[in-house]
Design a protein with these regions (language model features):
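Small/polar-residue-rich loop-to-helix segments that shape phosphate-bearing ligand pockets
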Residues: 1-46, 107-126
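Predominant activation on well-ordered alpha-helical scaffold segments within soluble catalytic domains
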Residues: 6, 10, 36-43, 63-66, ...
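Generic secondary-structure signature for well-ordered alpha-helical cores
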Residues: 10-18, 40, 44-48, 67-71, ...
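Structural motif
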Residues: 20, 51, 165-167
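Glycine-rich phosphate/pyrophosphate-binding loop at beta-loop-alpha junctions
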Residues: 29-115, 169-197
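Active-site-adjacent helical/loop segments in soluble small-molecule enzymes
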Residues: 104, 109-163
Length: 197
């Protein structure tokens, strides 16, 4: 796909156009700038935030947050979308910030991929149901559900301690709900126990 896209871009440039190829997952240093702004908003509203937990797909969201908050505050939960997530995030973050962001400096949980990208497994189902019951929030099983499972695991293993100011960034995922209708039905059924008020 990359070679074909470059060929088409070259043809368009010859005609005076200014094409831009949107990479897999939409992640590029340019796209990550949107999440720099998101991170700036988090920092302005919660200056003492210690952890921002986010799903790590193609890397742009995490890289943008790192651009605003630094590596020490951002915890990415790998969803299995790319083969070497730390390499991808380090490269995007380095390009975005203009400094050398190393893979060793990143906080990435690799324990929620389970059997593979988009394949539902028990910790994600538990996180989805617990979040629906406790907060009335439905999570998708591919991204936000895995991120919440990673947040819960980080609390269990002490990476995130009680009373530390933590933000969970729900990045959407509506299309991911349609491939897992039974799981979503269970999460929605859990909403019956939620009291809104």
């Amino acid at each position: 796909m990359g070679a074909v896209a470059e060929e088409v871009c070259a043809q368009l440039r010859e005609r005076g156009a200014r094409p831009y190829v949107i990479p897999f997952g939409g992640s590029s240093a340019l796209a990550a700038r949107g999440y720099v702004e998101s991170g700036d908003q988090i920092r302005m509203q919660l200056p003492d935030v210690e952890h921002v937990v986010v799903a790590l797909g193609s890397g742009g969201t995490m890289a943008g947050l790192i651009g605003a908050l630094g590596e020490d505050r951002v915890l990415g939960v790998d969803c299995g979308a790319v083969a070497e997530p730390a390499d991808v995030v380090a490269a995007l973050s380095s390009e975005l910030t203009g400094r050398d962001v190393t893979t060793a400096s990143l906080r990435i949980r690799l324990d929620q991929v389970g059997p593979g990208y988009g394949v539902l497994h028990e910790p994600v189902m538990e996180a989805m149901n617990a979040t629906a019951r406790a907060e009335g929030v439905v999570l998708d099983p591919t991204y936000s559900g895995r991120a919440m499972a990673g947040l819960m695991a980080a609390v269990r293993d002490g990476d995130i301690r009680p009373n530390q100011r933590t933000v969970f960034l729900h990045t959407g995922g509506l299309p991911g709900l349609f491939g897992h209708t039974q799981t979503v039905r269970r999460s929605v059924a859990a909403l019956d126990s939620v009291t809104f008020g």
